[in-house]
């Protein structure tokens, strides 16, 4: 099996048409739905550690033909992903999981630090999303 980064979504469609055994998974949580629309088969979603139901619903809603609902689910993780600007995405995810009551430990150095501003932003986003019923 071969893994590669594809930045051009049209390439997904072109490649799929050339080789029916070539499957595309989105490695970026914010691109799961766009990849599915171009013929991708799913995603590897780090944010699913925090919002498993939301992330799995993107795929399920797409498969059910409920594109507007899938778009809403895809868009709903944007506020969480915005916290990534404060540190390594894996650090933010692990901190979020810990703040939700699951002590999974820190990332290894040098990716084990999230500044106070990032922790505050994360706490705010987690609360806002919990108030919306996201999980």
Language model region names:
Residues 1-6:
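Short, small-residue-biased leader/transition segments that mark boundaries at the very start
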Residues 7, 29-30:
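Short beta->alpha connector loops
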Residues 7-14:
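Active-site-adjacent beta->alpha loops and helix N-cap segments on the catalytic face
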Residues 18, 30-135:
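Structured C-terminal cap/extension of enzyme domains
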């Amino acid at each position: 099996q071969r893994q590669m980064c594809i930045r051009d979504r049209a390439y997904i469609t072109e490649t799929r048409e050339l080789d029916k055994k070539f499957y595309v998974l989105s490695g970026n949580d914010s691109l799961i739905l766009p990849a599915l629309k171009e013929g991708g088969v799913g995603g590897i979603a780090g944010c699913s550690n925090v919002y498993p139901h939301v992330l799995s619903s993107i795929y399920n809603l797409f498969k059910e033909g409920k594109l507007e609902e899938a778009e809403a689910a895809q868009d709903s993780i944007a506020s969480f992903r915005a916290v990534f600007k404060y540190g390594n995405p894996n650090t933010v995810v692990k901190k979020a999981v810990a703040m939700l009551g699951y002590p999974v430990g820190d990332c290894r150095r040098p990716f084990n630090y999230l500044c106070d501003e990032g922790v505050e932003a994360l706490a705010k986003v987690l609360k806002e999303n919990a108030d919306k019923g996201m999980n």
